[in-house]
Amino acid sequence: MIRIIKNAIPFLCGVAFFISCNSKSEFLTPVCFDGKYPDESAQDIEIVVSDSGEVNFKIFAPVMNKYEGANSYMDFPEGIIVTSYSNGEKHSVLTADYAISEDRIQRMEASKNVVITDLQKKESIRTEQIIWDKRNKIIYSNVEVVQIKADGTTNRGDGFEADERFTKYSIRNPRGEMLANEF
């Protein structure tokens, strides 16, 4: 009996090996996402960007997805809020419904209902797309923008360019309404 069991064990292992290794891979699918799914994902994130202990920017997003590879990037599919600071005080706030940040080229693009508010001047710019060039420390847009000033007047333009903290900016081809002081 023991001899039968000793001979049966290698036979059963061999049968199991050949049965499990067939040419059809019905149950085995290689895991290769090709960048369609994030390598990392986080919810309710806050990123603090500082220099020498001084906060320059705070970035908040409900969802952040990170994709690794030669052209690694992060996207913020549910929106983003970027607050810039100057001398420890909030200076401006950017909100958008979507954003993508590309590491290699040091560029962030925000799109869909983009609003940048200068908290000191109480002015804002609304547009559908902006690009933050981190290398050159500028923010710009090449699509229509609407500027809303503190007094309620509005100007339109064909884009704008600003420093990355949004302390100085200019609108391309401005047009709109102006309030004249009464004499």
State where each predicted segment sits.
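Mature-chain termini and adjacent capping regions
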Residues: M1-F183
